[in-house]
């Protein structure tokens, strides 16, 4: 089962490697990882997407709390939350395929950010499912040349904050 963890940690040298080391030492896979400083430059927020059952997730959370740099851990899937991912995709198309790429980009509320005679580069933001659906929608009419995805970022909805 897909899980998203939000981790608030000190913005210190080595903090990221200690979290990654915890996952690799225990054989847990990280599907995606994003990390950046928060509005407080001494803190970073890390969003980790992983796969596991309730028991595995509980173990991961307990181990994360033991790390000295980690201040808070929250599973975003446990309540109302918003999540987004950004994707850049380079698409090769001609004729009808170019029209379909433009049409699908509009439908999915993306942006064409670069154009050459044979390629479009499209930027799209949304849930992972939305990005996957966009890729599926153009596979039959164009060739996907290259894809770069940011990984999931997310926050709890409403008054719940992580400080």
From Swiss-Prot:
Entry GO CC: acetolactate synthase complex; cytosol
Activity regulation text: Sensitive to valine inhibition.
PROSITE patterns in the cross-refs: ACT
GO biological process, one term: isoleucine biosynthetic process
Disulfides per UniProt: none
CDD domains listed in its UniProt record: ACT_AHAS (cd04878)
This enzyme's EC code(s): 2.2.1.6
Entry's transmembrane regions: none
Molecular function (Gene Ontology), one example: acetolactate synthase activity
Cross-referenced InterPro entries: Acetalactate_synth_ssu, Acetolactate_synth/TF_NikR_C, Acetolactate_synth_ssu_C, ACT-like_dom_sf, ACT_dom, AHAS_ACT, AHAS_small-like_ACT
Segments forming domain ACT: 4-78
Keyword tags: Amino-acid biosynthesis, Branched-chain amino acid biosynthesis, Transferase
Residue stretches in coiled coil: none
Further comment found in the protein's record: E.coli contains genes for 3 AHAS isozymes: ilvBN, ilvGM and ilvIH.
Family of the protein in this entry: Belongs to the acetolactate synthase small subunit family.
Family annotation (NCBIfam families): acolac_sm, PRK11895.1
Official protein name in the record: Acetolactate synthase isozyme 3 small subunit
Chain's gene name: ilvH
């Amino acid at each position: 089962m897909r899980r998203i963890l939000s981790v608030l940690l000190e913005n210190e040298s080595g903090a990221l490697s200690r979290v990654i080391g915890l996952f690799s030492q225990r054989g847990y896979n990280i599907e995606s990882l994003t990390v950046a400083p928060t509005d407080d430059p001494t803190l970073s927020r890390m969003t980790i997407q992983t796969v596991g059952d309730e028991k595995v997730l509980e173990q991961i959370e307990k181990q994360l709390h033991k790390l000295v740099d980690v201040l808070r851990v929250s599973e975003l899937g446990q309540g109302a939350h918003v999540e987004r991912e950004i994707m850049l995709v380079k698409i090769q198309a001609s004729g009808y395929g170019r029209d379909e790429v433009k049409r699908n980009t509009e439908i999915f509320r993306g942006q064409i950010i670069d154009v050459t005679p044979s390629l479009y580069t499209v930027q799209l933001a949304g849930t992972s499912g939305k990005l996957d659906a966009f890729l599926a929608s153009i596979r039959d009419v164009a060739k996907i040349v290259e894809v770069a995805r940011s990984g999931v970022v997310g926050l709890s909805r409403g008054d719940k904050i992580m400080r």
